[in-house]
Amino acid sequence: MSDGSLLDELGWRGLIQLSSEGLEERLAAGPISGYIGFDASATSLHVGHLLQVFLLTHLQRAGGRPVIVIGGATGMIGDPSGKSSERNLLDETAISANSASLRAQLERFLDFSDGPTQPRMLDNRDWLGPMSVLDFLRDIGKHFTVPYMLAKDSVQARLAAGMSFTEFSYQTLQAADFLHLHRHEGVDLQMGGADQWGNITAGLELIRRVEGRAEGAEAERAEAEG
C-alpha cells in the first residue's frame, strides 16, 4: 500500500468522517509522518484506543511514519472532550507509571525495525514541561482568540456545567504539540477520534499562524466507530 491509497483504504473501512482541505494532495506528494496522542491519564489502553492504533498500523503499512505522543504533560490536565465533568488531576508519580505502561503496550502493535517507517515514540513533557507560563502565553496563547476557543464543541458542551481554565486551555496544549512535531519531526498529519476534531483544527490553525502558511493535514476516524 502507498500513502496515496491510504485514504481509499481507510475510507473503504468507514474510518474517515472528517478531513482537512489539502489532505489528499499532501498524501499524493509522498511519504508522510502522522501522529496520534495518548494521554497518560490511565494505567492501560482501553477499547476506545483500538481504532487509533489501527490507524497507526495502516499508516505504517502505507509507507508513512507513525509518531506516538504519550501525553505525560497533557495527561496531568485531562482532555475535556467528550467528558461531562472535570477529571481528577494525577500527580507526577502516577503519570510516570502510566506513561511507562502505555509505552510497553503500544510497542506491541507497530514494527520498530530500522527504516523510513520506523515509529517514533515521544513524551510531550519533554517540550511542554520546560516551557514557562510566560513563554507559553507569548508564543502559543497569543495566536488564539477567546471566541475561537469558545466555539469548540468540547467547550460548548461544558459551559453550562462549568469548566476550569485548566481544561479550557487543553486545546492550546494539544495545538502546541502539533506545532512542535511539525517543526521538529516533520509531522503533517494528526489523526484522532471525532471528539478530537476541535483540538486537531486548533493545531492546524496554530501552524498556519506561526509558520505563515496553511500547512499540515489531518484525518479523523468516524465517531460511530469509536
Give the location of each predicted region.
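NTP-dependent nucleotidyl-transfer catalytic core
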Residues: 1-225
